[in-house]
C-alpha cells in the first residue's frame, strides 16, 4: 500500500531521519523529518499551470506548530490553534529566505510549503528539521529547484563551535547562529551573539556550512532512492529584439534617473521612462504576458545601469563611494511625556524610537510549545506606507515587520542590564517615518538611544549597518549603508549590529551562488568601520544613560522572609490592596520573598516600603515601642496594645504601674497612646509588654523618712 523510503544520518549529536511515501501522498511531495523526539511533517504542493498575468514567483511558506505536539490543549474559548505566533512567522521566513533564490528566473508557478510540527522535544528546536524537510520535499517534488539546501544551528561554548546545540547548551552559549546554503555556497545567516569578534562570527558561518554537507549529501541520496519525476520546464528565451527596443526608448532616461540623488525625484524620472515604454510598446491589444515581459526587461535595464556604474568605479546612486555612511542626525528626548525617545536619521531613512518602562506585570507571557515563559524586553517595528511616500492599508504587522523587529531586538539583547540590576520591563517601538534602505538597522540605533534616554543602564552603545554586494564574474563591490534600490538590485543584503568590541547580531541573505569567505570577510571589515563611525556619533549625542524620566515608574526592591508573604498579602489580599490603595503604588511579590514596588513618586514608594517593613518586622525583646491601646481585657487581666501593624502584645495588670493597680480602666483607655517595653516573645509569637518598666521606681520608705 505504501511505497515508503527512509534515510537516516547522524547530524552532530542528533540522529535525523527522513521518511516519505506514507503520509500526505496527494501532495507533490511530503517528507517527515525526525530529530530526536522532534518531528516535523513538510508537504510541498505545486500548480502545473501559471495563472494568467502572473509576473512574480508565488512561493508561500507556512510553518505551523500544533499544541498536541507538546501534549497540550490550546487555551482560549475555542480551544484550537489560531493565528500564527511570532515564532511561527519567524521560522516561516527562515525557511523561505534560502529557498527563494534557488528557483530560476521566469518560474511563476505556485509553490506552497507547509511545515507542521507534530511532535516536539523541548531540547531540540523544530526550525532546523523544518528547513531540512522543506529542502528534501522540494527536491522530491521535481520542480526546477537548484537545491538541496542544508541548514545548521551553531553555538559557541568555551571557545568551541557546537553543531545543533540543545536548549540547555544554548543557555551557556555566546552565540545562536542559523546558517543555510547549498553544497557550494552560503545563502542565509540569522544570528545573535554576546559581543563576539568578526572572525568568530565568520568562523561560525564557515563551520556551519562545512557541517551541513552531511545533510545535503543525505538528501541527495534520499532523492536518488526515491527517483522523482522532474518537471519538463524551460526558462523563457530572452527576446533580444524587444530588449533592444526597450533600451532604445528608455535606456538614456534610466541612466539620467540614477544620477538624481533624491529618492522621490529619481522615482518620478523612472516613472517617466516607463511611461514612454508603455506608450510605445503596450497597447490595448497587448496581452498580459507580453506586458509583463516588457516590464521585466525594463527592471533588468534598471539593474544593469546601477550595477555597471558601481563596478566601473562611478559614484553610487546618491553620489557616495562604496565605503561612506550617509549623513547622520541624532536627537533624543523628542517626546516630552514618554519615558525615553530618539529620532535617528541616516540620509533618507529615519526611525522614531520610543522606550517605555514597566513593572514585572508588564512582561510578555509567551505560551510556547516548549513551555510558558516571560520576556522582559520587547521591540516592535512599524513600517507605515507614508515612510516611502505611498498610499497603503494600515493593519496588523506583516511578516517583514515581525522579522525586522526581531533582528533589532536580537542586536540589543546582549547589552541589556541584568534583572537584578535593573528590574524594569522594557518595550521599544520603532516607527519608521522615512525609508530608503536599512530601516531595521536604524531601529537598532534608535532603539539603543531611546533606552539610554529612558535611563536604562546599557552595557554599551549598539549600532547597526546594512551592507550590499554587486558581483559580476571576478569583479565585485561591497557597499556600505545601502539604499533601497541597491538592496533590490544587488546580490547580497548583509546586516551587522554590534558595539565597539564586537558583533551582537548578524543577518545575511544572498541571492546568488559564488559569495566566497574572502568576500564575506571584506564585508564584515567594512561593516565594522561603518559601525564604529556611527557609534562615535551616537556617543557624542548620548554618552550614557540619562536620568529616569519623571513620568516613568519608580521601582523599589526589598526582600522579606517567605513565611511573611502571607502577612503582607493579608486575608483574601486585604492587606496588600489596602497598601496599594493608600500609597498609589503597584506591588508584586515573588515566591522567594522578593517584593517590587512601582510608584510614580519617591515618597509613595517609600511609604509603601515602610508599611511592608512594619508588617514584616519582628518585635524585639528589650526594645521600646510607642503603641496604642486596642482593648481592655475582661476580669481586669490587663490590656492589649498594638505596637506595629499586625503586632499586638499583652500588658498584664502587674506591668501597668509600680503601685498596686486595682482597676485597669483607671490607668488605660482604648485609643490611648503609651510607651511600652517588650519583655518577652514566646514560641507561639505572643508578646509580653510592660509600661511599668519605663517608669521611675518610687523612692524607698526609709529614704522618704529621712
Swiss-Prot record:
SMART domains: KH, S1. The gene is pnp. This is Polyribonucleotide nucleotidyltransferase. Keywords: Cytoplasm, Magnesium, Metal-binding, Nucleotidyltransferase, RNA-binding, Transferase. Belongs to the polyribonucleotide nucleotidyltransferase family. One of its GO terms (cellular component) is cytosol. It comes from Neisseria meningitidis serogroup A / serotype 4A (strain DSM 15465 / Z2491). Its cofactor is Mg(2+). The keyword Glycoprotein does not apply. Residues 553-612 form the KH domain. PANTHER family: POLYRIBONUCLEOTIDE NUCLEOTIDYLTRANSFERASE, POLYRIBONUCLEOTIDE NUCLEOTIDYLTRANSFERASE 1, MITOCHONDRIAL. One of its GO terms (molecular function) is RNA binding. It is an enzyme of class 2 (transferase).
Amino acid at each position: 500500500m505504501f511505497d515508503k523510503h527512509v534515510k537516516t544520518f547522524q547530524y552532530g549529536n542528533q540522529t535525523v531521519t527522513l521518511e516519505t511515501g506514507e503520509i500526505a501522498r496527494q501532495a507533490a511531495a511530503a517528507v517527515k523529518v525526525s530529530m530526536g523526539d522532534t518531528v516535523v511533517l513538510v508537504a510541498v504542493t505545486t500548480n502545473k499551470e501559471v495563472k494568467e498575468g502572473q509576473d512574480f514567483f508565488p512561493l508561500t511558506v507556512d510553518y505551523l506548530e500544533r499544541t498536541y505536539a507538546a501534549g497540550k490543549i490550546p487555551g482560549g474559548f475555542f480551544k484550537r490553534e489560531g493565528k500564527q505566533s511570532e515564532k511561527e512567522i519567524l521560522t516561516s521566513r527562515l525557511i523561505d529566505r534560502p529557498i527563494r533564490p534557488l528557483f530560476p528566473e521566469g518560474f511563476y508557478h505556485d509553490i506552497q510549503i507547509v511545515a507542521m510540527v507534530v511532535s516536539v522535544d523541548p531540547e531540540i528546536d523544530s526550525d532546523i528539521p523544518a528547513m531540512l524537510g522543506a529542502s528534501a520535499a522540494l527536491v522530491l517534488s521535481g520542480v526546477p529547484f537548484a537545491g538541496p539546501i542544508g541548514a545548521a544551528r551553531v553555538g559557541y561554548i568555551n571557545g568551541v563551535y557546537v553543531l545543533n546545540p540543545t536548549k540547555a547548551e544554548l543557555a551557556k552559549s555566546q552565540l545562536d547562529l542559523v546558517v543555510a546554503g547549498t553544497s557550494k555556497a552560503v545563502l542565509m545567516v540569522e544570528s545573535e551573539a554576546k559581543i563576539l569578534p568578526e572572525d568568530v562570527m565568520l568562523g561560525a558561518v564557515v563551520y556551519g556550512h562545512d557541517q551541513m554537507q552531511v545533510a545535503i549529501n543525505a538528501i541527495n541520496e534520499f532523492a536518488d532512492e526515491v527517483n522523482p519525476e522532474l518537471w519538463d520546464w524551460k526558462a523563457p528565451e530572452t527576446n533580444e529584439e524587444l530588449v533592444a527596443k526597450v533600451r532604445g526608448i528608455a535606456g538614456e532616461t534610466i541612466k539620467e534617473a540614477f544620477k538624481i540623488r533624491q529618492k522621490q525625484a529619481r522615482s518620478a524620472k523612472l516613472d517617466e521612462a516607463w511611461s514612454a515604454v508603455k506608450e510605445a510598446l503596450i497597447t490595448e491589444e497587448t496581452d498580459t504576458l507580453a506586458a509583463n515581459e516588457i516590464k521585466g526587461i525594463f527592471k533588468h535595464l534598471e539593474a544593469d545601469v546601477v550595477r555597471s556604474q558601481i563596478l566601473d568605479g562611478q559614484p553610487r546612486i546618491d553620489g557616495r563611494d562604496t565605503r561612506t555612511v550617509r549623513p547622520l542626525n541624532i536627537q533624543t528626548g523628542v517626546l516630552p511625556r514618554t519615558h525615553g525617545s530618539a529620532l535617528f536619521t541616516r540620509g533618507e531613512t529615519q526611525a522614531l524610537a520610543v522606550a517605555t518602562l514597566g513593572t514585572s506585570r508588564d512582561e510578555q507571557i509567551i505560551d510556547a510549545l516548549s513551555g510558558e515563559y516571560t520576556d522582559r524586553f520587547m521591540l516592535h517595528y512599524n513600517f507605515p506606507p507614508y515612510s516611502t511616500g505611498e498610499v497603503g492599508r494600515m493593519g496588523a504587522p506583516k511578516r517583514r515587520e515581525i522579522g525586522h523587529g526581531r533582528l533589532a531586538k536580537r542586536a540589543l539583547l546582549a547589552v541589556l542590564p541584568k534583572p537584578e540590576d535593573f528590574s524594569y520591563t522594557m518595550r521599544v517601538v520603532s516607527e519608521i517615518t522615512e525609508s530608503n534602505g536599512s530601516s531595521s538597522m536604524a531601529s537598532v540605533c534608535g532603539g539603543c538611544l531611546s533606552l539610554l534616554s529612558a535611563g536604562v543602564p546599557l552595557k554599551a552603545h549598539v549600532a547597526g549597518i546594512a551592507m550590499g554586494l554587486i558581483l559580476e564574474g571576478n569583479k565585485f563591490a561591497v557597499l556600505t549603508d545601502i539604499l533601497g534600490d541597491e538592496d533590490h538590485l544587488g546580490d547580497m543584503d548583509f546586516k551587522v549590529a554590534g558595539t565597539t568590541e564586537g558583533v551582537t547580531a548578524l543577518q545575511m541573505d544572498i541571492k546568488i551562488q559564488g559569495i566566497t569567505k574572502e568576500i564575506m570577510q571584506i564585508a564584515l571589515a567594512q561593516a565594522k568601520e561603518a559601525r564604529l563611525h556611527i557609534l562615535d556619533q551616537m556617543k557624542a549625542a548620548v554618552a550614557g544613560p540619562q536620568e529616569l524620566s519623571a513620568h516613568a515608574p519608580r521601582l523599589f526592591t526589598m526582600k522579606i522572609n517567605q513565611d511573611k508573604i502571607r502577612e503582607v498579602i493579608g486575608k483574601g489580599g486585604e492587606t496588600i490592596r489596602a497598601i496599594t490603595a493608600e500609597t498609589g503604588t503597584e506591588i508584586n511579590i515573588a515566591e522567594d520573598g522578593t517584593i517590587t514596588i512601582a510608584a510614580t513618586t519617591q515618597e509613595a514608594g517609600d511609604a509603601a516600603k515602610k508599611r511592608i517593613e512594619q508588617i514584616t518586622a519582628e518585635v524585639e525583646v528589650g526594645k521600646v515601642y510607642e503603641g496604642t491601646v486596642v482593648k481592655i481585657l475582661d476580669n481586669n487581666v490587663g490590656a492589649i496594645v498594638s505596637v506595629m501593624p499586625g503586632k499586638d502584645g499583652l500588658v498584664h495588670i502587674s506591668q501597668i504601674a509600680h503601685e498596686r493597680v486595682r482597676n485597669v480602666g483607671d490607668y488605660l483607655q482604648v485609643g490611648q497612646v503609651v510607651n511600652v517595653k517588650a519583655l518577652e516573645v514566646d514560641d507561639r509569637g505572643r508578646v509580653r509588654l510592660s509600661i511599668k518598666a519605663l517608669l521611675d521606681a518610687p523612692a524607698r520608705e526609709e529614704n522618704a523618712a529621712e
